Amino acid sequence: MEKWFIASKRADFNKIGEIFHISPVTARLMRNRSLTTVREMQRYLYGSLSDLYDSHLLKDADKGAEIIKEKIETGKKIRIISDYDVDGVSSNYILYQGLKRCGADVDYKIPDRVEDGYGINEHLIEKAAEDGIDTIITCDNGIAAAEQIAYGNSLGLTLIVTDHHDIPFQRQEDGSISYNLPSAAAVINPKQKDCPYPFENICGAVVVYKFIQVLYDLFGIDRRESEVFLEIAAMATVCDVMPLCDENRIIVKEGLRRIQHTNITGLQALIEANHLEEKKISSYHFGFILGPCINASGRLTSAKDALELLLCEDKELCRQKAEALTQLNAERKEMTANGVKAAKEYLESTGHANDKVLVVYLPNCHESIAGIIAGRMKEHYHKPVFVITRTKEGLKGSGRSIEAYHMYKEMNKIKECFDKFGGHPMAAGFSMQEDRLEEFREKLNANATLTEDDFAEKVHIDVALPISYLSESLINEFELLEPFGNENTKPLFAQKDLYIKGMRVLGTTGRCLKLFLSDANGTSIDAMYFGESDVFLEELISFCGKEEAQRIQKGLSHHIWMDVTYYPQVNEWRGQKNIQIVIQN
């Protein structure tokens, strides 16, 4: 079930168009992204690195830099401990290279997803002490590790936490909230309530990018040297699904510009392994091609493989490593498809598909892909989904949510069910014992206040734009709005009453449908639909009947008109350009 909404934000779109030399349509698209002032729009369209916030505003960044400077100058050993996803690997890379530039004696460890689980733990701390490490810096983890940090302190280690995740909290009997910060020598996280940094929604890699800038300032190193990390910080921002607004937009835009001629040999090899060297790389390539290759190592082997690729400078070795990661990602895709199929079968067979919050138990699923499966299931059912699998220590799970359900807060209400948990409003991870599974499902659903309205997929349309209005110049102008992603989605347009003149299935898999459409005034346009063509045809039959559907497929006259949402594009084939639309709904 879907509900379509057309944005109705008001402004003088002609005036905005005149100021920025753009069409009123593009002006409307900017207003739909909650931009109200000329300054905001100027920064959105043409923001540069000079518009980024002062790194020194991050609470404890200066304090942490002073500590690290003293450790470097006295020859102390430093160890980085990161997460194993794209943001964790990227954070580790930036921190390692930045500390090396400052002369640090530094190494790194990345927790094994299966053996160690998420984040810093007692074993990693003990190993650091055994190895003669003086200082541990966490990145993309540590904010929820108060006990582990305290244990490190007891062993005489210096610990610095850099993270971007939500601060753990407890709700008191009087309704007030108390936050539980780790007792590290410095805690650098923009989500701290007393942190003056103006924008809290940055990823772990951007946090350490900012920290390295502060460190460079302290060492008298030109901070422009830190710009070599921008393409890595940009990739992490997209892959960690940070909102692509404010300074994140600038970082990603600049990173995409630089990646076309990156000096990071391993990253260039990964681009070539995925046959992207001749393409203009976009946020899509970060999120759906390059990022998943880096993630695949942390999921199926070791995230060290991905980090070693980024650190490697030998072209042939980089080529081998990049091809291995690309192949690993192909295996991950197949495992995911099998897992999604099993998850749907589980829900239907248990009768839990009707629950408000879906809890799927797949004991034999590889724990590393539980989050991906949860995401696919959320898209299919449009409900919050937890996918849980069995491990040596008990159960581990990942959750993905919908807008109406704050996953982390809901889990915090039943924290007695977990051994460990953490996350965001839209995603979470946890571990628990098997005898808690049914209690977990029951309590989540008992507490859930979700309604059928919350489960309806909400389709937000930017503009009802007739196909007759489309032109190549207008479509090219929409590129000003890139990069697209979370909170800066690709614009969605709508057209009512399109007549289907014909259609045909393309490709061997049948997953692509080409339609030939026209409006009431006779304007014709080609359209592509990249969903399940058989599902599309089934819905067509259910809507208009088998006989009428067959007439449509054969290109015969009929009485069916279709409403669509779409994004326009300029298609080039054998030197010829034509405008087509890609149907979304």
PLM regions: where:
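Short, well-ordered strand-loop elements centered on a beta-strand within folded domains, enriched
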Residues: 176-179, 185-187, 393-401, 524-528, ...
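Short alpha-helical basic/polar micro-motif
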Residues: 206, 371, 375, 564
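Active-site cavity-forming subdomains of large catalytic enzyme subunits
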Residues: 126-205, 209-218, 228, 245
